UniProtKB/Swiss-Prot annotation:
It catalyses: (2R)-2-phosphoglycerate = phosphoenolpyruvate + H2O. This is Enolase. It comes from Dehalococcoides mccartyi (strain CBDB1). The lineage of its organism: Bacteria, Bacillati, Chloroflexota, Dehalococcoidia, Dehalococcoidales. Pfam families: Enolase_C, Enolase_N. Belongs to the enolase family. The gene is eno. InterPro entries: Enolase (IPR000941), Enolase-like_C_sf (IPR036849), Enolase-like_N (IPR029017), Enolase_C (IPR020810), Enolase_CS (IPR020809), Enolase_N (IPR020811). GO terms for molecular function: magnesium ion binding; phosphopyruvate hydratase activity. NCBIfam families: eno. Mg(2+) binds at D243, E286, D313.
C-alpha cells in the first residue's frame, strides 16, 4: 500500500543571500514527512523557468515569495491531496498541467519545485530509504568529483575579474573524503597566497575569495600557486575548471573583457579559450560563450571538445528541448543541472538521462542563493552523475552538501566509487 499526500504547507524562508525563497513540508497518509527548500540564482539564463516573486517593493525590495507560497497552500495543495507519493512522474505531470504555461509562470518554478522535492523526500521516508537510494536502488554508486569555486569574479563578486568562477577539481583523489580534503587544503592555501599579496580575502556568494586582480590570467596563476603550495600537482592531482558566465560579457554580438580592454568576436572568443587550454591545466569550461551563440559553441566544441569538458548552463537551462538541439548540433559535450531552472524533479532527471544517453556528462549544481537543503547531494549520487558543483568548502549552505556526501560515502562503504578522471566521459 503506497502512502498518499495528506497535506502540504509552504512558507517563506531566507536563502544564503538574505533573500526570500520557498520551503515546503509534506506529510503522507502513513505519517511520513518530507521537507525541501528551493535555491535562487544571480546570473540567470533568459530561458529559465520563472521564479515567482511578489514585486511588492514594500517587502523585501519586491523579492518576497508570498504569491508562490500561496500557490502551494491553495491550488497545488488541493490538486495533490490524496495523490500517490511514489508516483513522482505523475505528480510532476500534474503540476505542469496545473500551471499550464510553457515556462511555469503561473504557479512559479519555485512553488512547483518545493512541492516536487518535498513529496520525493516524504516518499523516501515512507520507504525508510535515504533519498539517493529511493531515486535509484542500485548495487553500486558513483560519488561525484567536486568543483570547488575558490575564486569569484563577475556577478558573484563586485570588484574582481571578468569571469565569474575559477574552480579546482581534485581529479587525482581516491575517495570523495580525500577530494574534499584536497580542495579544502587548496582553499586555505589560496587564502595565504592572497594575504601574502596584500589582497582582500573576503568571500563571495559561494564562499570563494574575491580579490582585486589586474587580469583574468592572474586568477589562474594565483590558483596554480596555491595548488603547489598545498603540496599538489596541477594537471595531475588537481585540475582547473572555469565558469566565465559569458552571457554576462556579451552585448551586440561581441564579448567585452573589461579588465583586458578587449572586445572579441565569437570566433576570437573561441580562440581565446583555445589559448588558455593550451597554457593551463583546464579540464572544464562552463558557459564559455553566450547562451544563444550556437555557431560559437559548435566551433569551440570542434576545436577543443575532445580535451576539455564544455558545459552548457545558461545555454541549456536544464531544458531537454534545448539539450536535444545541442546534442544534435554537437554544440558542447556536457550540461549543468540546476533543479530550479526547470522546476520539477522528473524533468531534471530526464535531462540527466538524455545527456548520459548521448555520451555527455551532467554536472549537478547549486545556485548562488542557496539554503541548508542537501537534495542535490543525493541527486548527484542517485544519478551517478560523477560531478557536483556546490561552491567553496566554506559557508554552511555549501558545506551542508559536502558533509551530506561524506555521510553517503561512509554509509555506502565498498559500494561507493570515486571516479576521478573517469567522470569526464568524453576526454581523450
Amino acid at each position: 500500500m503506497s502512502a498518499e499526500v495528506k497535506s502540504i504547507k509552504a512558507r517563506e524562508i531566507l536563502d544564503s543571500r538574505g533573500n526570500p525563497t520557498v520551503e515546503a513540508d509534506v506529510v503522507l497518509s502513513d505519517g511520513s514527512f518530507g521537507r525541501a527548500a528551493v535555491p535562487s540564482g544571480a546570473s540567470t539564463g533568459s530561458h529559465e523557468a520563472v521564479e515567482l516573486r511578489d514585486g511588492d517593493k514594500s517587502r523585501y525590495n519586491g523579492l518576497g515569495v508570498h504569491k508562490a507560497v500561496a500557490n502551494v497552500n491553495t491550488s497545488i495543495a488541493s490538486a495533490i491531496s490524496g495523490f500517490k507519493a511514489s508516483d513522482q512522474q505523475g505528480l510532476d505531470n500534474l503540476l505542469i498541467e496545473l500551471d499550464g504555461t510553457p515556462n511555469k509562470a503561473k504557479l512559479g518554478a519555485n512553488a512547483m519545485l518545493a512541492t516536487s522535492l518535498a513529496v520525493a523526500h516524504a516518499a523516501a521516508a515512507s520507504r525508510h530509504m535515504p533519498l539517493y537510494r529511493y531515486l535509484n536502488n542500485s548495487e553500486e554508486y558513483i560519488l561525484p568529483v567536486p568543483m570547488f569555486n575558490i575564486l569569484n569574479g563577475g556577478k558573484h563578486a563586485s570588484n574582481s575579474t571578468d569571469f565569474q568562477e575559477f574552480m579546482v577539481m581534485p581529479v587525482g583523489a581516491k575517495s570523495f573524503a580525500q577530494a574534499l580534503q584536497m580542495g579544502t587544503e587548496v582553499y586555505h592555501s589560496l587564502k595565504k597566497v592572497l594575504k601574502g599579496m596584500n589582497q582582500n580575502t573576503t568571500v563571495g556568494d559561494e564562499g570563494g575569495f574575491a580579490p582585486s586582480l589586474p587580469t583574468n590570467k592572474d586568477a589562474v596563476e594565483v590558483i596554480l600557486k596555491a595548488i603547489e603550495k598545498a603540496g599538489y600537482r596541477p594537471g595531475e592531482d588537481i585540475f582547473i575548471a572555469l565558469d566565465p558566465a559569458s552571457s554576462e560579457l556579451y552585448q551586440d554580438g561581441k564579448y567585452t573583457l573589461a579588465t583586458e580592454n578587449k572586445t572579441l568576436s565569437s570566433a576570437e572568443m573561441v580562440d581565446y579559450w583555445c589559448g588558455w587550454v593550451e597554457k593551463y591545466p583546464i579540464i572544464s569550461i562552463e558557459d564559455g560563450l553566450f547562451e544563444d551563440d550556437w555557431d560559437g559553441w559548435k566551433l569551440l566544441t570542434r576545436k577543443i571538445g575532445n580535451k576539455v569538458q564544455l558545459v552548457g548552463d545558461d545555454f541549456y537551462v536544464t531544458n531537454i528541448k534545448r539539450l536535444d538541439r545541442g546534442i544534435k548540433e554537437k554544440a558542447s559535450n556536457s550540461i549543468l543541472i540546476k533543479l530550479n531552472q526547470i522546476g520539477t524533479l522528473s524533468e531534471t532527471i530526464a535531462a540527466i538521462k538524455m545527456a548520459n544517453n548521448a555520451g555527455w556528462t551532467a554536472v549537478v549544481s547549486h545556485r548562488s542563493g542557496e539554503t541548508e537543503d542537501t537534495t542535490i547531494a543525493d541527486l548527484a549520487v542517485a544519478m551517478n552523475a560523477g560531478q557536483i558543483k556546490t561552491g567553496a568548502p566554506c559557508r554552511s549552505e555549501r558545506t551542508a552538501k559536502y558533509n551530506r556526501l561524506l555521510r553517503i560515502e561512509e554509509e555506502l562503504g565498498g559500494k561507493a566509487k570515486y571516479p576521478g578522471k573517469d567522470a569526464f566521459l568524453n576526454l581523450k
